[in-house]
UniProtKB/Swiss-Prot annotation:
Gene responsible for this protein: acpS
Superkingdom of this protein's organism: Bacteria
Family: Belongs to the P-Pant transferase superfamily. AcpS family.
Protein's job: Transfers the 4'-phosphopantetheine moiety from coenzyme A to a Ser of acyl-carrier-protein.
HAMAP family in UniProt: AcpS (MF_00101)
Cofactors named for this entry: Mg(2+)
Main location as per UniProt: cytoplasm
Protein name: Holo-[acyl-carrier-protein] synthase
Upper lineage: Bacteria, Bacillati, Actinomycetota, Actinomycetes, Micrococcales
Cross-referenced SUPFAM superfamilies: 4'-phosphopantetheinyl transferase (SSF56214)
Amino acid sequence: MIVGVGIDVVDVARFLAALDRSPRLRDRLFTPEERDLVGGSLAARFAAKEAIAKALGAPGGMRWHDATVARVPGGAPAVSLRGTVLAVADGLGITSWHLSLSHDAGIASAIAVAER
């Protein structure tokens, strides 16, 4: 059963410009596993974190490091949760996540579907 759906889009150039203006922003938004990504891939990871938050109803107290978006063997995106995001997901009975990320023509997008 679908518990929540979230979607987000990011203007890649604006996002990267924000990271350039504030070098500490990369550390605040991304876990160490995500920080080496560049360009559209990094913007898509941010869009995924936003989409995950929206699928959960944008819980208060969420920290950006509460969700790590990585690739599993074969290339599909997967999410690892901790902290507030994990507590909210557990409280909603979420047992699986489906993510889709894309970036093209200067736009990065992500959709997150939470299921129980």
